[in-house]
């Protein structure tokens, strides 16, 4: 089983950049066109960890093989109980239970903070990602059609939503910091 922990912005940035860079270069899963540098990832992790969890999975040798994180769904205050979530694993780590462990821990962290909704945008088609999200209870809520252009074609993005906790009656308490 993988070891899961909070990402260290400085020490994990190179591994995170290497994993993500393959998806940027070789797939349409992410709409970024240039792989971010380790320095850019260190900054992203550092900015996000003040409000949302950013986790990594290590294999038996202690090498980072995947990451998952939450970030604000939108900037406006009314959305503060919702988080966008993402997960990336190196290809050799797919279908080994690492993604489920990583995402499950991320959702537990979000619940502990008092967040109520997790949202995921998935470039379509992507049967593996859709299946992973559905296995956690995500439901489809819509599709942005032909929203992004990458690798010579227009791409759809499916939006999926998971209720992390029931919405309280009355004013909900503000989410807590990680």
PLM region spans:
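Helix-loop element at the rim of GNAT/NAT acetyltransferase active sites that forms part
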Residues: 18-35
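Acetyl-CoA-dependent GNAT
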Residues: 33-92, 103-104, 109, 163-165
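Conserved GNAT acetyl-CoA-binding A-motif
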Residues: 110-122
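Conserved acetyl-CoA-binding loop-helix of GNAT-fold acetyltransferases
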Residues: 95-108, 131-135
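Conserved catalytic-core motifs of GNAT/GCN5-like acyltransferases
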Residues: 69-72, 119-122, 134, 139-156, ...
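Acidic/histidine-enriched, glycine/proline-rich intrinsically disordered or flexible terminal extensions
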Residues: 166-178
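A short beta-loop-alpha structural element at the N-terminal edge
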Residues: 2-16
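Conserved beta-strand-loop-alpha-helix junction that forms the acyl-donor binding cleft
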Residues: 94, 120-130
């Amino acid at each position: 089983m993988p070891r899961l922990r909070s990402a260290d912005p400085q020490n994990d940035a190179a591994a995170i950049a290497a994993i993500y860079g393959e998806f940027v270069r070789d797939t349409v899963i992410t709409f970024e066109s240039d792989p971010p540098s380790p320095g850019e990832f260190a900054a992203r992790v550092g900015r996000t960890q003040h409000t949302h969890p950013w986790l990594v999975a290590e294999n038996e040798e202690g090498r980072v093989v995947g990451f998952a994180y939450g970030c604000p769904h939108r900037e406006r205050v009314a959305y503060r109980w919702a988080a966008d979530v993402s997960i990336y694993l190196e290809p050799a780590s797919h279908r080994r239970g690492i993604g489920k462990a990583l995402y499950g821990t991320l959702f537990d962290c979000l619940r502990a903070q008092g967040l109520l909704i997790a949202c995921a945008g998935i470039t379509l088609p992507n049967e593996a990602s859709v299946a992973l999200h559905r296995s956690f209870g995500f439901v489809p809520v819509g599709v942005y059609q032909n929203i992004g252009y990458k690798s010579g074609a227009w791409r759809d993005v499916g939006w999926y939503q998971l209720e992390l906790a029931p919405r309280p009656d009355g004013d909900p308490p503000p989410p807590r910091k990680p």
